[in-house]
């Protein structure tokens, strides 16, 4: 059975730990902080088998070097570090090109992992899909999506469209607890969305109890995430009103997404 556990890091990061019981070897996703990972490994008597990286940003990769040294000192093994080939991340020794290699089989996990090409937030951003779990870094957030630091709006829309087509029961493990702020924006865009209203209440209660709102699900995101709903008339009307666009012609999805991202950037 695959178990997935969150390690909190920095202000709002989640580092995900993947373990297939009864194995004591685990993988971690996007370890920006080595110290919290090592503390978790020691307290749970676990060994680190590998690291999965989604993109190059420091809050996702900053702990890799120290974790590599830790594994070499404690087990004399070479740590397997998987990451996007396009981004030349330090310590990655298994570079992944999702255009050439779309599946991985990792020791101790006993499951096929699909490697997905999801550029937008960064030029080479990738995601990992294992069983019913998606590890999507900073591409898809609950009720939101990542900023466009290196990629284009067209790339990000394509990436989000790809993720939205995953099975509805897919659990979404993004890397940040941004849900409440994203929901505030989503409700500004689509104030009459009953699913949004209900989830804002639920998420507010969860955060008041210091509970994580992650994982989300693809089904939930289809219902509440404005960036997955750019074809909905309610979203289109809101964008046209915000940007004072009287043109009666329906905006295409790319234009809607581009304007929605611009709106969110200054929200």
Curated annotation (Swiss-Prot):
The gene is gloB. Pfam families: HAGH_C (PF16123), Lactamase_B (PF00753). Zn(2+) 1 binds at residues 55, 57, 121, 138. InterPro entries: Clx_II_MBL, Glyoxalase_II_hydrolase, HAGH_C, Hydroxyacylglutathione_Hdrlase, Metallo-B-lactamas, RibonucZ/Hydroxyglut_hydro. Belongs to the metallo-beta-lactamase superfamily. Glyoxalase II family. NCBIfam families: GSH_gloB. Its EC number is 3.1.2.6. Keywords: Hydrolase, Metal-binding, Zinc. This is Hydroxyacylglutathione hydrolase. Monomer. GO terms for biological process: methylglyoxal catabolic process to D-lactate via S-lactoyl-glutathione. The lineage of its organism: Bacteria, Pseudomonadati, Pseudomonadota, Gammaproteobacteria, Alteromonadales. It is an enzyme of class 3 (hydrolase). Binds 2 Zn(2+) ions per subunit. Pathway: Secondary metabolite metabolism; methylglyoxal degradation; (R)-lactate from methylglyoxal: step 2/2.
